[in-house]
């Protein structure tokens, strides 16, 4: 449709403009990574100044603010985004939802402690994350049975990473907590190595889990978050792992 085509054009325009502005202000920075807090904050500012149609403006602001929360790494980031939620004319329901997402993200930012996060093993027993980490540097990644083609690519990527970085523990966490049987079927069907495959236990923020698909969290040996804004498809993923190992 014409509207869809226009929105796609607008999406690309905002992306390109955010890259241009980043390059202008930060010559040494990697400005092409769009999945960062800073890039999303830049795009929110662009929407605020350039888009005046109420419906389009609302749609973009809600979307970019939600993504900005998910890529936030610090308390300062979340406080800034909280002011944006109050600044724009969102409904009370939407404000409540976004503030709830901030609350959830605050448990995943850098230096957050994930020892007591509840996960479910393949015998359907509940465990604390710290119990399966074996005091190793770990990379946690989330996935869903509802994306089978992506699941196959993920397995290929993870197997390559396991071979390259044998001292890192790669832990897969499935988000389909309502479908344990389908999860078990998927890991036995697709995975040659089913060690370190778990399912998240549902809690009050369960409706947000799907927003975190593809995100990767780097944990030190004490189950503390050291990096949380990376996605598995990042072209510099190896560099992020090497920097992580060197910093520990």
Locate the predicted segments by residue.
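Oxidative protein folding and maturation machinery
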Residues: 1-124
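Short, internal strand/loop/helix patches
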Residues: 10, 22, 42, 184-221
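Short acidic, S/G/P-rich loop/turn micro-motifs used as interaction or catalytic elements
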Residues: 69-72, 145-149, 177-178
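Short active-site neighborhood of thiol/selenol oxidoreductases, capturing the structured segment around
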Residues: 127-158, 169
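Loop/turn elements at helix/coil->beta-strand transitions in domains of secreted/extracellular proteins
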Residues: 134-138, 165-169, 192-195, 221
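Structural microenvironment flanking redox-active thiols in thiol-disulfide oxidoreductases
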Residues: 149-189, 201-206
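Thiol-/selenol-based redox modules, centered on thioredoxin-like
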Residues: 218-248
């Amino acid at each position: 449709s014409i509207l869809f085509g226009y929105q796609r054009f607008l999406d690309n325009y905002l992306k390109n403009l955010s890259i241009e502005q980043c390059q202008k202000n930060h010559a040494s920075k990697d400005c092409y990574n769009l999945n960062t807090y800073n890039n999303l904050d830049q795009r929110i500012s662009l929407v605020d100044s350039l888009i005046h149609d109420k419906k389009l403006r609302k749609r973009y602001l809600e979307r970019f603010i939600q993504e900005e929360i998910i890529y936030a790494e610090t308390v300062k980031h979340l406080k800034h985004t909280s002011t944006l939620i109050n600044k724009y004319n969102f409904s009370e329901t939407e404000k409540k939802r976004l503030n709830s997402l901030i609350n959830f993200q605050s448990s995943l930012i850098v230096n957050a402690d994930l020892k007591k996060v509840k996960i479910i093993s393949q015998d359907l027993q509940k465990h604390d994350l710290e119990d399966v980490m074996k005091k190793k540097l770990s990379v946690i990644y989330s996935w869903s049975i509802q994306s089978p083609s992506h699941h196959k690519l993920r397995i290929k990527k993870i197997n390559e990473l396991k071979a390259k970085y044998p001292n890192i523990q790669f832990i897969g966490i499935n988000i389909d907590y309502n479908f344990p049987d389908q999860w078990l079927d998927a890991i036995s069907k697709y995975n040659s190595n089913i060690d370190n495959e778990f399912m998240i236990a549902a809690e009050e923020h369960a409706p947000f889990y799907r927003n975190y698909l593809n995100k990767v969290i780097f944990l030190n040996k004490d189950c503390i978050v050291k990096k949380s804004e990376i996605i598995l498809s990042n072209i510099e993923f190896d560099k992020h792992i090497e920097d992580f190992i060197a910093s520990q």
